[in-house]
Amino acid sequence: MKSYECPFCKRVFHRQEHQVRHIRSHTGEKPFECSYPSCKKRFTRRDELIRHVRTHLRKALVTPEQTLDVNLHKAPDSKPEGDKSTGQEADKSQNQSKDGSITDPVQAAVLALSVAYAKPTSVSLSPTDLQAQSKLIEKPRRRSASNATGSLNKKNQDPLRRFSISESAGAAAPTPSPSNSKSPPSENRKNRLQNVLSPIASNNVPDFNQNYPTESNPMFLSTPRFQNTNGQRTLTVPVSVWDARQPPTSSRSGLPLSVMYNHFPSVPIPPATVNDTSMEYYLPNAYPHPTGISLPFYPFDSGIPVSPNIPVSPSSSFVPMYPTTFPSSKPQIVNAPPAPSYFSPGSSFGAQLCANGSTLLRADTKQYGLALPKITNSNLISPNQTFNPVKSSVKALPTLEPPSSPSHATATSSLHTLFHTAPSRSYD
């Protein structure tokens, strides 16, 4: 990136105008002078000059009756009412003095503001020069017919022009009038427009295809549709909107159409088999997996926690909760009452549940879709019977008893007895 250094303070700037503005702070140069009459202030920066000239314009708009400090000659109050030219000449003489300087404060402020906004050039413009230029701009510019034709001929020399010189001259022939400007286009303009559009129409532009997707054209629809053809219902199943279109009559590659378009968009269905089941087969399946699902068998010793009252190995009376094959893709939810993970001897809920012969389902095995075996009548528990639990692999831990006398230092059961395999006990 190019840098600009100040020769006085060695300050570096990235833009040259910033360097020039900074150097003026060292030299004290003020190149921007206020061009408002009777104001000789100078400024270092252009934005400061513009801000200053705006104050002159604001004061002139607020108090327009105040005039500048120049030789001002007011027009006499007595003016003939019928002579308007004398009044206009008096206004001009009021705005300008004998030496040609502007005496109207508003006009002088506007001209000074335009000078402040103007870019610096080699030739400085005075307020009188700016006033002369503004008068030239206000004059209406009227071109003759020859100048208009010459400009059209220059434009027509461009090779990118689509119209010929004669057509352009014919377009410029009508004179602008209020009636012609609002009239509709003439016949020659329509002919020229048609000539311009003819090369576009001559190209190989395909015509509009009337076979757009509608109810009358089911071949162009992306959803399956039923049709009755010769007393037989046909289900139209297009692969996609693009593939379901009519195949072309000719093949560019030379291959037969049966090889190129080997898909068939229509599947015939006998009328007797059209029901809800067949519709589920032919319609798109919302589930990506197949409809038939076979669940594997999970043994109880595969890491799933079991209750002490349930045998570890599966018995012959094991009844699965779900069938091996589902009739549909959606799994059926079995509403089974939640069962506790253990059954106490005095629990009437467990006895009643077992007496009904229903399948027990623990809460921790519900997410795996497993069912527990039915408990037979031989294992029923009642409050009046003695508790005879099923032999389990989980050993009962002895309870810690408090010492019988204060002289004993330890309890009756130690850590060795907690982790030692106790012999099996039998209950009479």
Curated annotation (Swiss-Prot):
Residues 145-154 have a biased composition (Polar residues). It comes from the Eukaryota. The keyword Transcription regulation applies. Keywords: DNA-binding, Metal-binding, Nucleus, Repeat, Transcription, Transcription regulation, Zinc, Zinc-finger. GO terms for molecular function: DNA-binding transcription factor activity, RNA polymerase II-specific; RNA polymerase II cis-regulatory region sequence-specific DNA binding; zinc ion binding. Belongs to the creA/MIG C2H2-type zinc-finger protein family. Its main location: nucleus. Residues 71-92 have a biased composition (Basic and acidic residues). It is found in: Nucleus. Coiled coil: none annotated. Residues 67-103, 133-190 are annotated as: Disordered. The lineage of its organism: Eukaryota, Fungi, Dikarya, Ascomycota, Taphrinomycotina. A zinc finger (C2H2-type) spans 4-26, 32-56. Induction: By glucose starvation. This is Zinc finger protein rsv1. Involved in maintaining cell viability under glucose starvation conditions. May have a role in regulating genes involved in gluconeogenesis. GO terms for cellular component: cytoplasm; mitotic spindle; nucleus. GO terms for biological process: regulation of transcription by RNA polymerase II. InterPro entries: creA/MIG_C2H2-ZnF, Znf_C2H2_sf, Znf_C2H2_type. Residues 166-186 have a biased composition (Low complexity). The keyword Zinc-finger applies.
